Amino acid sequence: MSDEPDSPPLPPEAEAFLRHLAEQKRYSARTVRNYRQALERFTAWLRGQPGSLHPLMVSSRHVRRYLMELQTVYERRTSNLHLSALRSFYRYQLRLGKIEASPLAGISGPKLEKKLPKFLTEKQIALLLAGPKRLLENEAIEPFTALRDRLVMELLYGGGFRVSELSDLNYGTFDEQSGVARIRGKGGKERLCPVGEVALECLKMFRAQFARHSGPQDPVLITEQGRRLSVRRIQLMLKRYLDLADLPHDLTPHKIRHSYATHLLDNGADLRLVQELLGHASLSTTQIYTHVSVARLKDMHRRAHPRA
C-alpha cells in the first residue's frame, strides 16, 4: 500500500489486535502487515478530525466519510482490504466488550468485478513439472536441486497448498503411510491434505537421498545449506521453470493452487470436498472454480458444436 501518510503510533487496542492475529489466529506476516497499514492510515485520519478521535469513539458516520475518502485514493479492491481490516478490528473489540456496537455494521465496501482465477491446463502442468529433469539432463543444475525443485512443484500441485503452507511443511506434518499432510492454514484452521502417490514418492526419494537424518520438526523443503526454503525462494524458483516451459510469467505459486482446484472439479470432484481440501471457510470462495469449469465447457461447446 503506497502513498500512506506518516504513521502515528497505534493505540494499545490496535497493537493487541495485531498480536492476536499473529499469535492466536496465525495470520501470515503479510496479512498482519497489511492490517497494520490499514489501521495506521485510519488512525492518522482520525487524528486529523475535529477532536482528534480515538478509534473506539467513532461512529458509522465517521466510517462512511473515511470510506468515501479511501475510494478517491485507492482502487476498489484496496479500499475493501482496508475496510476488511477495520471490520475485523471492531469485531474483536466488540467481543472483548470494549464497544457496544461495531461502527461498520450495515456498511459494505464497493462492489468488485468478479475475475475468474487464472490456472494452468493439465498439459501446461506436465510441462512445468518436467522442467527440473530437463535442466538436470543438460547438467544445468545439481541432482539435489533437481529433485528438490520437482518436489516443490509436485507438492504444490498434488496438495493444493498455499505457498506459505508449503514453506512451513515439516516431516512431522506428513503421514508417509497414507500420504496425507496435516496443515494449519489461515486463521489457525487445521485440514488434511492428501498429496497423491507421485508427490509422496518424490518426497520419500528426496528424504532418502538428501535428508536421511531429518526428524519430525525438520523442514521438508530446504536449501543446499539445509535451511528452510523461504516463500520468496519458492516464488523465484517457479519463475525459472515457467520461463523454461515458455509459460506466462504472471503465473504464481497460487495459480498452481487454482489449477489444482479447477482440475479436481473438471474431473468430477464434489464442490464441498474441494472446499475442505482448500481450507476455504466459505463455500462461495470455492464456487468461483465452478465458474471456470463452466466457462471451459462453454468454450468447448462454441468451438465444437456446428450451431454454436
Report the location of each language-model feature.
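Conserved catalytic core of the tyrosine transesterase superfamily
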Residues: 1-308
